[in-house]
Amino acid sequence: LGGKATFEVGNKRFEKVGGRPNVLAGLPHSVYMPAGVDFTIKAEGAVQVALPSAPSDLEIETYVIGPNLVTTGVWGAANFRRDFRQILTEAGQPQLPARRLIVGETITPSGNWSTYPPHRHEKDDLPREAYHEEMYYFKVLPADGFGICRYYNDDPVEENFTVRDNTILMAPKGYHTVVSAPGYTTYLIWFLAGEHRTQATVEDPNLSWVTKTVPMLTELGH
């Protein structure tokens, strides 16, 4: 997430991986490690590292995902515009071998919504929907700010959470969305795990019309 660290994975050593001072100051560096290996992470000064994992039977060598392999772009438009960084996804990094795990980052500007329209990924019904467990780790900048995260489904179940700096939330099922408080930027790194690495989601049908406005809003400069 920030700083540099040296990784020793089995008999391999990766010196001073990283570089950005914080999550907003550049693209991430990552190290993909196969299951069952011993590893050591040595901090090279102040460092913050995220360690997502998922069961895997893939036998591969450890590899580094540098900023040159990170896919960036924009999702949405206007006040639901957010920037994404795909670190380990089937769509963004099809050349990288992985099993079950999907990783990326999203930066939501002041007052904007993310994961909007709200979507879900709670059952395997490909190509329409793929089941994935999901976890978010949030940073809020400046750190005294907050955001709001909403989960809901058809049961009915509805939960709303205040998101603060260093909040961790899970999204095992249901529709979910996040909004940044005005004056604050919300960063989140998302980890998904499932049998399929294809990201197929279903939007809330009551709000899915919003997606159809993106081309028009983009053309108008929003």
Regions inferred by a protein language model and the residue ranges of each:
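Glycine- and acidic-residue-biased ligand/ion/polar-headgroup-sensing regions
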Residues: 1-15, 33, 110-111, 122-167, ...
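Ligand-binding loop in jelly-roll beta-barrel domains
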Residues: 22-60, 164-165, 173-199
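Structured loops at beta-to-helix junctions and adjacent beta-edge loops in soluble globular domains
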Residues: 52-55, 106-107, 111, 141, ...
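A short glycine-rich, His/Asp/Glu-containing loop-to-beta-strand
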Residues: 79-135
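Double-stranded beta-helix
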Residues: 22, 46-89, 150-152, 189-222
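Secondary-structure boundary elements
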Residues: 40-45, 58, 94-97, 142-145
